[in-house]
């Protein structure tokens, strides 16, 4: 039986020998050395992941964690709270942004209810902790035990999907007001004032942004999360969707498989996961630079450079779906290009 400790202890660094071998092969392909730029770096990163059998990925999946947030009551979003459950239903119909992009990328979408403030939505994986987290502006989002249990449950869900053949994961989230706890988590882990982190989320009016900043600042002051303790931070100022995404990262990394990040809330979850197990970072693939204000700061602390710059801020896992094409391209380059030595071409470099 898996425990959170056993999953964390199974996370190891990338295989440097395999990565060096891949770099040598890439340098021998029919192209100038390094001319594929970061696509080559991606192929080398994938080579170091012991869960992959060469550069072959047969099944891809985006896990979307869905939850409501008590801090919604502080007026930090203009979207109706009911939109969380309604949009989760739309995901089951396959008509949302992530569903369309995932289908285009050859990936399936698994939608998980970790805390929707509604009755169970048909078709969703039911891992509901509560009907919405606590209001972080008034107290903790959840208990420490709830955070630990959800981390483990999410990691185990990921391991279950791996037994079903999934080799590449993306993470996504859905939940009205969730950029507020995400901003709180990023503020704590990066030691920045919320003024530097808080953004407009789902079109929150810029003239009211000072209120959202104040709410995040109040949440941190009231809960006093310990930045050295990821679970404490997630429990006090996070949310069920953030915890769920962090659990996916831990689970995939524990068996050496990659996880593609999405936008700002996934950066918050990644910061937490990497504090729990620093080697998780090597299994993360940053898809795009979210347009949310604190994104650059979060990614700098993760030491990750996003591949795509599209001014996106939809969430759901939409950026992860787009980046799956890049992973496919890196594998195709490695597997299918010819060798320079067999091309009758002699390059001066």
From Swiss-Prot:
It comes from the Bacteria. Signal peptide: none annotated. It catalyses: 5,6-dimethylbenzimidazole + nicotinate beta-D-ribonucleotide = alpha-ribazole 5'-phosphate + nicotinate + H(+). Pathway: Nucleoside biosynthesis; alpha-ribazole biosynthesis; alpha-ribazole from 5,6-dimethylbenzimidazole: step 1/2. GO terms for biological process: cobalamin biosynthetic process. The active site is at 316 (proton acceptor). Gene3D superfamilies: 1.10.1610.10, 3.40.50.10210. GO terms for molecular function: nicotinate-nucleotide-dimethylbenzimidazole phosphoribosyltransferase activity. Its EC number is 2.4.2.21. Keywords: Cobalamin biosynthesis, Glycosyltransferase, Transferase. The keyword NAD does not apply. NCBIfam families: cobT_DBIPRT (TIGR03160), PRK00105.1 (NF000996). Belongs to the CobT family. Catalyzes the synthesis of alpha-ribazole-5'-phosphate from nicotinate mononucleotide (NAMN) and 5,6-dimethylbenzimidazole (DMB). This is Nicotinate-nucleotide--dimethylbenzimidazole phosphoribosyltransferase. It comes from Photorhabdus laumondii subsp. laumondii (strain DSM 15139 / CIP 105565 / TT01).
């Amino acid at each position: 039986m898996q425990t959170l400790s056993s999953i964390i202890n199974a996370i190891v660094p990338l295989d440097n020998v395999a990565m060096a071998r891949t770099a040598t092969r890439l340098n021998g392909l029919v192209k100038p050395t390094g001319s594929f730029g970061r696509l080559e770096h991606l192929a080398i990163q994938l080579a170091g992941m012991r869960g992959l059998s060469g550069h072959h990925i047969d099944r891809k999946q985006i896990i979307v964690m869905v939850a409501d947030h008590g801090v919604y009551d502080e007026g930090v979003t203009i979207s109706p709270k009911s939109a969380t459950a309604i949009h989760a239903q739309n995901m089951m119909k396959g008509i949302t942004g992530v569903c369309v992009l995932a289908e285009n990328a050859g990936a399936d979408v698994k939608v998980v209810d970790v805390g929707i403030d509604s009755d169970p939505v048909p078709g969703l994986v039911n891992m509901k902790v509560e009907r919405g987290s606590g209001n972080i502006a008034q107290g903790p989002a959840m208990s420490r035990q709830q955070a630990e249990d959800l981390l483990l449950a999410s990691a185990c869900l990921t391991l279950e999907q791996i037994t079903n053949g999934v080799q590449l994961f993306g993470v996504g989230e859905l939940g009205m007001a969730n950029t507020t706890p995400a901003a709180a988590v990023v503020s704590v882990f990066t030691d920045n004032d919320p003024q530097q982190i808080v953004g407009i989320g789902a079109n929150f009016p810029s003239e009211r942004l000072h209120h959202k900043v104040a709410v995040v600042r109040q949440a941190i002051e009231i809960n006093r999360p310990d930045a050295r303790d990821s679970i404490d931070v997630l429990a006090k100022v996070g949310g069920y969707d953030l915890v769920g995404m962090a659990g996916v990262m831990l689970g995939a990394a524990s068996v050496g498989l990659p996880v593609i990040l999405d936008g700002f809330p996934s950066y918050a979850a990644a910061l937490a996961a990497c504090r729990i197990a620093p080697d998780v970072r090597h299994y993360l693939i940053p898809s795009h630079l979210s347009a949310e204000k604190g994104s650059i700061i979060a990614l700098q602390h993760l030491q990750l450079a996003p591949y795509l710059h599209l001014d996106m801020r939809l969430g759901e896992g939409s950026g992860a779906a787009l980046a799956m094409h890049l992973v496919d391209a890196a594998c195709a380059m490695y597997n299918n290009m010819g060798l320079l030595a067999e091309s009758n071409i002699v390059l001066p470099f």
